[in-house]
Amino acid sequence: MHPAWFHIENEAEIPSPALLFYRSRIEHNLKLMIEIAGGDPKRLRPHVKTHKCAEIIAWQVQLGITSFKASTIAEAEMCAASGATDVLLAMPCVGPNAHRLAELALKFPQTAFSSIADAEDSIRFLASAAQQHRVTLGVYLEIDCGMARTGKLFAMQHYDIDILFISSFGCFRLSIR
């Protein structure tokens, strides 16, 4: 059996439940992430849904990790408030959430916000919100690569049509990777 790597000295004084950080272990893991990414923190976009913690995001930013993926508008806001310069909302942004994302772009102009899109309707919702709030948002076209889980079924013959459709709104940052 392995010895305990996390020992609390004053256990009786800590209210329960409580969120406890083992800082040296977290910092070790963050540095290992960067090492696995070839030493370049700009190659990373960690998902915050697993910890939902501003302090951990701030530690990542201090190490040069500035791009993040979020599952909710609240997580996206937490990332921006913690120093993120690039936040991807990992879901199509429709209805009120499209406006909330555009409002975040106004509130945090130093942060580039993006959302995924898998259908023309989600692109229209996002475009409408971006235009109404006079901001530029990023859009990632989610592609169904054959698993039939999420995304738009990719057909090379329609690729240029998708790009033209997205760019026609004039309010998106569009990058092809």
Language model segments and positions:
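N-terminal glycine-rich anion-binding loops that anchor highly charged ligand groups
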Residues: 2-6, 25-56
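Short amphipathic alpha-helical surface micro-motifs
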Residues: 1-3, 27, 97, 122-123
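Active-site-proximal beta-alpha core segment in soluble small-molecule metabolic enzymes
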Residues: 47-177
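Short, surface-exposed alpha-helical recognition segments that flank or form part
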Residues: 21-24, 114
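Generic N-terminal amphipathic, Lys/Arg-enriched alpha-helix
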Residues: 2-21
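Generic structural "secondary-structure junction" signal
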Residues: 16, 21-22, 50, 149
